[in-house]
């Protein structure tokens, strides 16, 4: 089977947005306009195509990124292949967003025309910035009360620190929103609002003529800056043609120099087709972005893999899903080469071979079996046993490890126990399966109480895990009160000289270590050896590091993992017969226990960035309540009919906040919360925590 579409005609992109910015509706419209869906599913009635998991449909939020392949004929009449990855907009699922951004070539950031740039938009934007993903902005919900296109554009600059390149102006707003002024071709596009209706093209309305001229001039000035020749011509008074302008906008977008901004309303079917045309005109194909780099397993050199069918096969597993019909599905982005059903793949991270059974092309939740796939494709593989998120699969003869994904540490823990004996065994299987799908979800066993503890990114995250366990694995469980994932650290340097000696007939044990423990700015553990003259033989030094690392998971105050510790081995002593790696491990462990106390151990707690959007009447109550939760108010900001309150609040004081806020504002205020940083716990609170966990 030969390649159906040239790789230059692929667009792998995602839609990123704050919860409720209309992302699912937009994806539905795109699938409808590109001919995949016959009946549009509205999120309001829980029938949306992309939201294929039951709970997503109930809660009206998108959780898992489902990959969908569809097609669109561009302005030039040529058909392109779109692989759309749906990303969740809720804060507890930033991990999903991170995974999808990792395998995208471009993205559309969706803004709510009334709210503009919201906190989750900022978070996702920063993640996209990290991977240098070219982005366009679509100001959605232009038909909504309080819709303000120009304020949204201003916020792209002020809140995201990004350069907005305005390509369209709205004609009317709120109920009177009719269409857009296209600044590239200087024309008006209007829609009657019926599903699938094409735009009618007309002259720019006279009251917008002057504004359109002004914005087109700004557009040209920004676009020519990306090319020296175009800049020179422009300064000499030569204007770029429409085709040249499109090429300049494409170049600047792909180089992430600016972000094209369009507008419309997906729900009312206005502005969707020009957005699809813009995906083709301005977002990159797999060959327009830098080739992915990785490490050659044989030589350990850095290598790149070009987006070409002739290059050695390399693909990245970015998502694992349980499918009721096929079992476990591993979603992969093919970066280079081609893959056929039935071949052997090397998993270079796990150092295991995988045999490829079925290969599927996914459309939301229908699927099509395929025999072969090529560079640039996004496919779902069935039957892989060892592969987890972030692993590289490649040609066994040309092994490579692509860049690893990094996942955040969970901030909240809950004890969970099966309701019946029958649920006991099934619960373990279910939790392990769910943890394989989601690297930000962890399962562990509490050694003292024997309880199973699940940890995640927030209350909603863990709610949904428990819910999925019930639905997909038929496991009923009781859950305890959420607990905060505290951490411990040290505040000053301490030098410990410790000798471990044991004589018990025959060979004894002997090891002496002198270690300086001190705090450092990062969260990780740093070990350094400054041993000179063989005071501790080289082969024993790894034992010292291993010994310290083995007790880093349990701090001296309340047994929480330690953060930000640096240990420097400066001196020591050994015995020719009695010393061993194990003896040095034991000595280092004891030295750390002493050192952590002497170095001023302290408890740390997760601090959450909280944003509350509330009607003005309740601002005083909201601020008073946040203060009572040990919150620090960092600012308030007025938005059309509501006020935004920003604060930093300890997670320990935010449990059950949703109910308090609801009753305080008669259900009219909303909030979002995400982990920001760790901070020392006030001493009075720290004592209570120590008593509780001692």
From Swiss-Prot:
GO CC term (a single one): cytoplasm
Domain tr-type G: residue ranges:
8-287
Q: Which UniProt keywords apply?
A: Cytoplasm, Elongation factor, GTP-binding, Nucleotide-binding, Protein biosynthesis
Q: Where is the signal peptide?
A: none
PROSITE patterns in UniProt: G_TR_1, G_TR_2
Q: What are the recorded GO MF terms, alphabetically? A: GTP binding; GTPase activity; guanosine tetraphosphate binding; translation elongation factor activity
Q: What superkingdom does the record give?
A: Bacteria
For this chain's UniProt record, which GO biological process terms are given? Answer: ribosome disassembly
Q: Where in the cell is it found?
A: Cytoplasm
Output the InterPro entries linked to this UniProt entry: EFG_II, EFG_III, EFG_III/V, EFG_IV, EFG_V, EFG_V-like, EFTu-like_2, G_TR_CS
UniProt KW Translocase keyword: no
What protein family does this chain belong to?
Answer: Belongs to the TRAFAC class translation factor GTPase superfamily. Classic translation factor GTPase family. EF-G/EF-2 subfamily.
Q: Which HAMAP family match?
A: EF_G_EF_2_B
Primary role: Catalyzes the GTP-dependent ribosomal translocation step during translation elongation. During this step, the ribosome changes from the pre-translocational (PRE) to the post-translocational (POST) state as the newly formed A-site-bound peptidyl-tRNA and P-site-bound deacylated tRNA move to the P and E sites, respectively. Catalyzes the coordinated movement of the two tRNA molecules, the mRNA and conformational changes in the ribosome.
Q: Which NCBIfam families match?
A: EF-G, PRK12740.1-5, small_GTP
Name this protein carries in UniProt: Elongation factor G
Species of origin: Bartonella quintana (strain Toulouse)
From the broadest rank down, the organism's phylogenetic lineage runs: Bacteria, Pseudomonadati, Pseudomonadota, Alphaproteobacteria, Hyphomicrobiales
Query: What gene codes for this chain?
Result: fusA
């Amino acid at each position: 089977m030969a390649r159906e579409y040239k790789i230059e005609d692929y667009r792998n992109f995602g839609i990123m947005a704050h919860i409720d910015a209309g992302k699912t509706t937009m994806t539905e419209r795109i699938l409808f306009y590109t001919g995949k869906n016959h009946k549009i599913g509205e999120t309001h009635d829980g029938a949306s195509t992309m939201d294929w998991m039951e709970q997503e449909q109930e809660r009206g939020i998108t959780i898992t990124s489902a990959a969908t392949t569809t097609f669109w004929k561009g302005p030039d009449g040529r058909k392109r292949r779109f692989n759309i990855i749906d990303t969740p907009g809720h804060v507890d699922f930033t991990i999903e967003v991170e995974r999808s951004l990792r395998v995208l070539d471009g993205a559309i950031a969706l803004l709510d025309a009334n709210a503009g740039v919201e906190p989750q938009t900022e978070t996702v934007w920063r993640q996209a910035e990290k991977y240098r993903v070219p982005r366009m902005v679509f100001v959605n919900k232009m038909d909504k009360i309080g819709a303000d296109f120009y304020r949204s554009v201003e916020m792209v600059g002020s809140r995201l620190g990004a350069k907005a390149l305005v390509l369209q102006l709205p004609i009317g707003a709120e109920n009177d929103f009719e269409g857009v002024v296209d600044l590239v071709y200087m024309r008006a596009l209007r829609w009657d609002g019926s599903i699938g209706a094409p735009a009618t093209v007309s002259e720019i309305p006279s009251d917008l003529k002057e504004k359109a001229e002004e914005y087109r001039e700004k557009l040209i000035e920004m676009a020519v800056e990306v090319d020296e020749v175009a800049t020179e011509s422009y300064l000499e008074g030569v204007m770029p043609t429409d085709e040249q302008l499109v090429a300049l906008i494409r170049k600047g977008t792909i180089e992430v120099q600016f972000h094209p901004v369009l507008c419309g309303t997906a729900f009312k079917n206005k502005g969707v087709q020009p957005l699809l045309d813009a995906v083709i005109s301005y977002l990159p194909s797999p060959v327009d972005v830098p080739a992915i780099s990785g490490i050659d397993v044989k030589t350990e050199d850095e290598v790149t893999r070009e987006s070409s069918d002739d290059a050695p096969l390399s693909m990245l597993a970015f998502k694992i899903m349980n499918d009721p019909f096929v079992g476990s599905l591993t979603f992969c982005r093919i970066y280079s080469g081609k893959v056929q059903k039935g071949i052997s793949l090397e998993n270079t991270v796990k150092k295991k071979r995988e045999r490829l059974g079925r290969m599927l092309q996914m459309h939301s939740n229908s699927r099509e079996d395929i025999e072969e796939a090529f560079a640039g494709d996004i496919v779902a593989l069935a039957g892989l046993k060892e592969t987890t998120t972030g692993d590289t699969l490649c040609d066994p003869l040309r092994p490579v490890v692509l860049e690893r994904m990094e996942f955040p540490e969970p901030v909240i823990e809950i004890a969970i126990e099966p309701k019946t004996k029958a649920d006991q065994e099934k619960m373990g299987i279910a939790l392990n399966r769910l943890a394989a799908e989601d690297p930000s979800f962890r399962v562990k066993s509490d050694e003292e109480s024997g309880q199973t503890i699940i940890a995640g990114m927030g209350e909603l995250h863990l709610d949904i895990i428990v819910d999925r366990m019930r639905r997909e694995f038929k496991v009923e469980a009781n859950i305890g009160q959420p607990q905060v994932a505290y951490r411990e650290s040290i505040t000053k340097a301490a030098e410990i000289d410790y000798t471990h000696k044991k004589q018990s007939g025959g060979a004894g044990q002997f090891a002496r270590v002198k270690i300086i423990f001190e705090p450092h700015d990062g969260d990780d553990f740093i070990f350094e050896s400054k041993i000179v003259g063989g005071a501790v033989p080289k082969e024993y030094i790894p034992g010292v590091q291993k010994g310290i690392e083995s007790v880093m998971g349990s701090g001296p105050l309340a047994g929480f993992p330690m953060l930000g510790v640096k240990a420097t081995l400066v001196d020591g002593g050994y015995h020719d017969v009695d010393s061993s790696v194990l003896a040095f491990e034991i000595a280092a462990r004891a030295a750390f226990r002493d050192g952590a106390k002497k170095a001023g151990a302290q408890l740390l707690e997760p601090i959450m960035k909280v944003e509350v959007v509330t009607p003005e009447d309740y601002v005083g109550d909201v601020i008073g309540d946040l203060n009572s939760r040990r919150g620090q108010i960092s600012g308030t900001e007025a938005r059309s009919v509501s006020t935004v309150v920003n604060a930093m609040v300890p997670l320990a004081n935010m449990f059950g906040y949703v109910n308090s806020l609801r009753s305080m504002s008669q259900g009219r205020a909303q909030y979002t919360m995400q982990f920001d940083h760790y901070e020392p716990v006030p001493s009075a609170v720290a004592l209570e925590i120590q008593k509780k966990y001692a």
